[in-house]
């Protein structure tokens, strides 16, 4: 049997075109390196939408431990990832717990080691470095070994190139690359982007997505007309 035929979605009895069950941890039969993250991740302050997957040769089960770093519950920052995102091996989300106070001459965190070094520490010098929640939109592709810094917002439909370091917000349907990542190309013209954002196909009922896969996978925006664009 060819490798292509072995990578068969594990639909577990669902009707054709209904797609895989988003609550299955490993949706591709005989390919356990790919996993839907929503049923795999139970860590506090991490929210992940349906059908978003992570691909790792060691398995996706340790995504929260391996890929979401310095995420401490007492800080309260959230990682929010939308639906239908593709996250490649080695992608990292650096959370606000990694930040150091930068207003003084030294960035060394003396206070965390105690033994008197905590005396006189002003928590405000650290808390003002908090960047807020990290938010990834829907239908975002994050390439291998990409690094997403604290508080970044990545728009719907964006692509983050492999090994990029994303330090600023990414517009919807932009392709960013580099360290620090910059927009190298917009995937579509402004009119098309507006139509896609209005349609928000990722929020459609799953049966409607299945019926319209050719349009979603295609690039002909002229076929996206009401009532096709409505979620019902």
Q: What is each PLM-predicted segment?
A:
Residues 39-46, 73-74, 78-79, 133-135, ...:
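Short, recurrent motifs enriched in small/polar residues
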């Amino acid at each position: 049997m060819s490798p292509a035929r072995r990578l068969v979605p594990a639909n577990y009895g669902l009707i054709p075109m209904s797609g895989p069950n988003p609550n299955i941890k490993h949706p591709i039969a005989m390919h356990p390196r790919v996993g839907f993250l929503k049923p795999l991740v139970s860590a506090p302050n991490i929210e992940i939408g349906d059908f978003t997957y992570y691909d790792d040769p060691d398995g996706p089960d340790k995504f929260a431990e391996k890929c979401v770093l310095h995420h401490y519950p007492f800080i309260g920052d959230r990682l929010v990832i939308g639906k239908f995102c593709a996250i490649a091996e080695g992608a990292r989300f650096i959370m606000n717990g990694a930040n150091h106070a930068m207003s003084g001459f030294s960035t060394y965190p003396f206070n965390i080691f105690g033994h008197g070094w905590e005396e006189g520490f002003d928590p405000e010098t650290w808390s003002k470095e908090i960047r807020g929640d990290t938010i990834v939109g829907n239908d975002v592709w994050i390439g291998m070994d990409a690094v997403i810094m604290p508080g970044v917002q990545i728009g719907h439909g964006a692509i983050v190139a492999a090994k990029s370091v994303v330090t600023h917000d990414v517009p919807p349907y932009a392709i960013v690359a580099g360290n620090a990542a910059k927009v190298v190309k917009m995937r579509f013209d402004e009119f098309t982007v507006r139509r896609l954002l209005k349609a928000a196909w990722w929020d459609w009922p799953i049966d409607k997505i299945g019926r319209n896969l050719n349009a979603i996978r295609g690039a002909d925006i002229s076929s996206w007309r009401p009532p096709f664009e409505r979620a019902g």
